[in-house]
């Protein structure tokens, strides 16, 4: 194990929203009648905030770039300072270690589902491999995300859940209870039940939340030479006392995990199959 003393902070993410001139005009009109940008505009005039770059407008604290070719959408990128801080640490660790693994915890998503890694995470993970890391292991969201083999090194964008017992927490903060209109002294189990009641698809009803993999991989000369995945399920349909902890998945569930993993890994060109108790790369 190798640890490096570094400034402890979250990685800053830069979101980029691109809209047409017409939509920019619409936002400008809304900002004018609502005053949503009032304080920011005043601070910008007084020099407390940097001027907006040409072709960029602000709305409600978000920056929008006006498209020149009519394309619209969202993208994101990691703060270059944070990337440099991380890759410098990787290179330093490589001086005394045989292999460096990077762990990333992220709840950000690309658009409107939990299956796709955000743009910034892909850029950051590949930068870590470029700097000498042998694998990047992601966690955060409750569902498996795709697995990429980048320069013969695995990037697990998110491994999902392994132990999922948040239904059984004993205490929740006051703001959680207030958010759901409950007394701050309400039992945690009641607070969680209230969240479930008002959800259109509760986490506890989604099979993918209860399915994951346990990776096994071998590294030689900084590269992955062998990779296999143990399919696991967390007992979605079991009784409470046996629920939310990992079990080796049966063959039917394991095949579903392999199919799901192939679908969410499609953008990375990796296909998976279930074979002899393990999920492996499709030959």
Predicted regions and their residues:
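Aromatic/hydrophobic pocket-lining residues that form the small-molecule binding cavity
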Residues: 83-86, 121
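Single conserved hydrophobic/aromatic residue that forms the stacking wall/gate
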Residues: 2-13
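Generic structural signal for well-ordered alpha-helices
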Residues: 86-91, 125, 214
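A short C-terminal boundary segment appended to hydrolase-like catalytic domains
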Residues: 14-77, 81, 171-283
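Short acidic, glycine-rich surface-loop motifs adjacent to enzyme active sites
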Residues: 60-74, 88-113
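Conserved beta-sheet core of the metallophosphoesterase superfamily
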Residues: 117-213
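A structural motif corresponding to the C-terminal end of an alpha-helix
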Residues: 89-98, 131-133, 219-224
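Conserved, mostly hydrophobic/aromatic
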Residues: 101, 157, 217
